[in-house]
Amino acid sequence: MVLMIVSGRSGSGKSVALRALEDMGFYCVDNLPVVLLPELARTLADRQISAAVSIDVRNMPESPEVFEQAMSSLPETFTPQLLFLDADRNTLIRRYSDTRRLHPLSSKNLSLESAIDEESDLLEPLRSRADLIVDTSEMSVHELAEMLRTRLLGKRERELTMVFESFGFKHGIPIDADYVFDVRFLPNPHWDPKLRPMTGLDKPVAAFLDRHTEVHNFIYQTRSYLELWLPMLETNNRSYLTVAIGCTGGKHRSVYIAEQLADYFRSRGKNVQSRHRTLEKRKT
């Protein structure tokens, strides 16, 4: 059974995540004190039910040792997994402005910006040990729920999930990436007027990139690097490996290469997901 701990900065989507987990069959508890986690797990052990618990800055223990002690006191039938949700500072400020809700640290007479920054520092011990970090900055409520359903179902099966995501450097580097590869040095279809409106998912763009030896070399060397270290990553109690491929705009080269890598590892029986940040952003 799984004890899913959901944490993250206020406004990043913890309530949405908890509802998605409830839909998946988890027994969900909102804002349970950390010291009560072992007691909850023991209560549910006989019922053979996985649980999900949200922890925010208000019920964080004063020292990381308290959290570690709670984790070590869990029944052996439960496997703890930590999901950390985050979003960039401007997105969090906008969400608070839209909802007009008070930040949990507002009682300390802090400005919203200062409260967000202090909360980030207080939650760092949880963020640093998270099994999965999800950046919700560009996600709608429905997109976040669907993404969690897709990823967490793979996680519950205790199989490492490889996530290949394309992005554009001009939009920023994804904060959930384990590895980031820069492909801006490769030939750019953008400069061909016929290819410019297309994406790396279109056959003419794929044919353009497929003609270049350096593209093949990059794909081969990148997948070889990942294959070399994948066995160690799989035995390191890791459930996700997020590989981000970036080009200038996130539309052509990064999309094509992310798909090529995803197809390669999928053909070898790995649990693989792919996403394209710039293309998803254009749909909204």
Curated annotation (Swiss-Prot):
Keywords: ATP-binding, GTP-binding, Nucleotide-binding, RNA-binding. Pfam families: PapZ_C (PF22740), RapZ-like_N (PF03668). GTP binds at residues 56-59. Residues 266-284 are annotated as: RNA-binding. InterPro entries: P-loop_NTPase, RapZ-like, RapZ-like_N, RapZ_C. ATP binds at residues 8-15. GO terms for molecular function: ATP binding; GTP binding; RNA binding. The keyword Kinase does not apply. Modulates the synthesis of GlmS, by affecting the processing and stability of the regulatory small RNA GlmZ. When glucosamine-6-phosphate (GlcN6P) concentrations are high in the cell, RapZ binds GlmZ and targets it to cleavage by RNase E. Consequently, GlmZ is inactivated and unable to activate GlmS synthesis. Under low GlcN6P concentrations, RapZ is sequestered and inactivated by an other regulatory small RNA, GlmY, preventing GlmZ degradation and leading to synthesis of GlmS. PANTHER family: RNASE ADAPTER PROTEIN RAPZ. Belongs to the RapZ-like family. RapZ subfamily. Homotrimer. This is RNase adapter protein RapZ. The lineage of its organism: Bacteria, Pseudomonadati, Pseudomonadota, Gammaproteobacteria, Enterobacterales. The gene is rapZ.
